[in-house]
């Protein structure tokens, strides 16, 4: 059995980096546990540019250096999957309402993620990859993750 792989939705990363309440504490606990190696945390390459844009308030030049530093800090314990033509083509051929969510779903399939951690679970309804919020993820870890992980 391999280590659990969790793909982070952008909203979870923003909750952590911006200390956004009331979600920050759970996102912080998630990041701490990932940092000490309890499981592997992932984001996609497309999320990196989204995060830079959002965290720098639309790309304000004065905020870019600090934003880069924050994401570099995140990179010390979060892996990045390089989105390829495969994921892009699957997203473009999909009928999902939100292309960004579909792309993240395709990344989850490509890295064989055990779950997507998000606050918007309805955006990821699928039997192929479970979508969990932070609380559900920790509950799942304690209860049945050892019997259902991939690899």
Feature roles, as predicted:
Residues 28-31, 35, 40, 46-96, ...:
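Active-site-proximal, substrate-binding regions of enzyme catalytic domains
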Residues 48-49, 110, 138:
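Alpha-helix N-cap/helix-start and coil->helix boundary motif
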Residues 128-136:
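Active-site regions of enzymes building and remodeling cell-envelope glycoconjugates
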């Amino acid at each position: 059995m391999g280590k659990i792989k969790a793909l982070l939705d952008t909203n979870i990363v923003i909750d952590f980096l911006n200390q956004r309440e009331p979600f920050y504490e759970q996102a912080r606990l998630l990041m701490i546990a990932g940092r000490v190696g309890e499981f592997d945390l992932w984001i996609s390459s497309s999320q990196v540019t989204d995060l830079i844009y959002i965290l720098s308030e639309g790309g304000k030049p004065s905020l870019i250096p600090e934003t880069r530093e924050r994401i570099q800090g995140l990179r010390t314990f979060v892996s990045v999957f390089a989105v390829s033509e495969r994921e892009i083509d699957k997203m473009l051929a999909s009928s999902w309402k939100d292309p960004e969510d579909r792309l993240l779903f395709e990344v989850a399939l490509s890295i064989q993620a055990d779950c997507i951690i998000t606050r918007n679970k309805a955006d990821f309804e699928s039997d192929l990859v479970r979508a969990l919020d932070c609380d559900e993820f920790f509950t799942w870890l304690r209860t049945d993750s050892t019997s259902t992980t991939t690899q």
